[in-house]
Amino acid sequence: MSLLQRIKQHLLPPSSRSFHAFETNANAEMHQLRLENTSLMQQLAYMSDQLTQITEQVNQIQAEHAYEQQRDMMLFWAEYQKPSESPIAAKKRFFRSLPKAKGNLQLLQDNQIKLFKEFDSICRNNGIIYWVGSGTLLGAYLYEDIIPWDDDIDVFMTRSQIAQLQELLESDCTYRITTLWDWYVPCKQIRFCLQDTNNPAFIDLFPLDLTNSDPEYAWNRVLEERASFVKDIRNEFQGTEWESIPYLPTTHPITKNIERLYREHVASLHDDINYVSSFEDATGLTRGIENIDELHSTGPYPINDWIPTQDMKYRDFSVMACSAWNTYLTRHYGNYFKIPKDINSHEHVANDYLNSEAVQNSMHHYLGK
């Protein structure tokens, strides 16, 4: 084909015959696509129907399983309970008969409890109030000890009393309070621990604020602000150094911006909630927006449910708890006499870390071994 013919073929419009042939072919392909699309839609409808049926069957199986589990537990407790024993006493006896922790977990728990006993002594000697929460409260009630598979201590304190404790320990040679911002949750971790950085024992401190606003309104308003705070954190700090250093010490330069954002949200709360500084003026307590989220909301916290505190036995000493401990535990766990599903997965301190020689030496030394 000559150069002139090739130019003519590319530049001149197609003939009527070739155009109609192309149109016929395109229409045929479009028809085939419509058929295939119709077939796919039919398959999708069938699969959707099948999924609905499977979901209904799964729900039915789960309901039957829940019923059978409940029936089996009723039969178990009826058999387990002694003639002269109350149902609650029987359940406590059962939980307290469960095997205790062994190995590294036992060593860590013994360190945690020794530290907790010393923390309690510091608080009582200095007029500082705290409340055990979450699994620590459950352990105090069910086991009079740490839960056999637990590895941390959770404590609530008012913000002003955390500050008082920090001031007490400012130049202490044995104890310290650490703070860092956690990207994963996100939250501000506040912990009471030893000056010995090789010892993994710690007590989580969760700040509460006193208010004389309506307790339920204040509680829900704080939940709203917490959600807004978390959203703003994700929007502002995603892709920053905080994401690559997920446990960010408060000495890091970027925390200035985190604290600025935090103060903005706290200021928003102060527009709607009246915060007070004394228990006498308070009608309730609210969680700080820097706290970790609860899986199930345990509030509101009317002040009469929390003050005065109630002592509960915890191994060889007593800990402070809220007087409405049953309400708190029920909101937090539902039926708290059930064995949880995270017995084997509950871990705050990695076992590999506990195995290190420096950590082992520190934990044994702290216990005087």
Predicted regions located by residue number:
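Conserved catalytic core of two-metal-ion nucleotidyltransferases
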Residues: 100-124, 169-224, 235-333, 339-369
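Active-site nucleotide-donor binding segment shared across nucleotidyl transfer reactions
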Residues: 120-153, 157
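A short, surface-exposed interaction/processing loop segment used at functional sites
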Residues: 229-233
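Helix N-cap motif at beta-to-alpha junctions
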Residues: 159-162
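Boundary detector for helix-to-coil junctions that initiate low-complexity/charged tails
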Residues: 1-83
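Conserved SAM-binding loop
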Residues: 165
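Tryptophan-centered motif/residue detector
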Residues: 68, 72, 131, 149, ...
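Helical scaffold of the NTase/Pol beta-like nucleotidyltransferase catalytic core
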Residues: 57, 63, 67-132
